[in-house]
Swiss-Prot record:
Membrane topology: Multi-pass membrane protein
Protein name (Swiss-Prot/TrEMBL): Cytochrome c oxidase subunit 2
Cellular compartment(s): Mitochondrion inner membrane
Disulfide pattern: none
């Protein structure tokens, strides 16, 4: 989860988020190198009064600054497209959960079970127990099995919402009348927090998301107790 004064991303808990972190580092290094080169050239031009007349109209330089940016864009586009295809790929999910956004709470339905659904509201600050997180705790957590592919079907009953869990690399819009899907896989158990990431009204800040990833045996026990 996020911490105060955090400068980087949350720790990755899914293969997709790990790929996104690597891609971020890759593109950031390219931006750093380009910025350093531009600043060096600017400082060189400002600190010298000499002008190289042959560079004012040189075919070689024009060729270089046409081909080099094209190569850089390809180096950015290829890993980006690879990650996009990975995020869209859903092969034989072990579990499907339908998520509906409301003003201002989430409702969940486990479609593989006959009658397993619930609403998830934020716990008010006055009702929190010691150690619980303000504006992030909910009355009903979404319990899911770890290390298994899970399909999330996401939509909305009223206005635009966005279902987002940063540590899992998830952010999917909840649009009325449209069903979007996302793949979720966690490599380790734990509690993972998110929030609605689309301004949806006066209580937009009070729509937390809490996923509890547990071993498969614990999930089976939980689902049996909920039915």
């Amino acid at each position: 989860m996020a911490y105060p004064f955090e400068l980087g991303f949350q720790d990755a808990t899914s293969p997709i988020m790990e790929e996104l972190l690597h891609f971020h580092d890759h593109t950031l290094m390219i931006v750093f190198l380009i910025s350093s080169l531009v600043l060096y050239i600017i400082s060189l031009m400002l600190t010298t009064k000499l002008t190289h007349t042959s560079t004012m109209d040189a075919q070689e330089i024009e060729t270089i600054w046409t081909i080099l940016p094209a190569i850089i864009l390809i180096l950015i586009a290829l890993p980006s497209l690879r990650i996009l295809y990975m995020m869209d790929e859903i092969n034989d999910p072990s579990l499907t959960v339908k998520t509906m956004g409301h003003q201002w709470y989430w409702s969940y339905e486990y479609t593989d079970y006959e009658d397993l659904n619930f609403d998830s509201y934020m716990i008010p600050t006055s009702d929190l127990n010691p150690g619980e997180l303000r504006l992030l705790e909910v009355d009903n957590r979404v319990v899911l099995p770890m290390e298994l592919p899970i399909r999330m079907l996401i939509s909305s009953e009223d206005v635009l919402h966005s279902w987002a869990v940063p540590s899992l690399g998830l952010k999917t819009d909840a649009i009325p009348g449209r069903l979007n899907q996302a793949t979720l896989t966690s490599t380790r158990p734990g509690l993972y927090y998110g929030q609605c990431s689309e301004i949806c009204g006066s209580n937009h800040s009070f729509m937390p998301i809490v996923l509890e990833l547990v071993p498969l045996k614990h999930f089976e026990n939980w689902s049996s107790s909920m039915l």
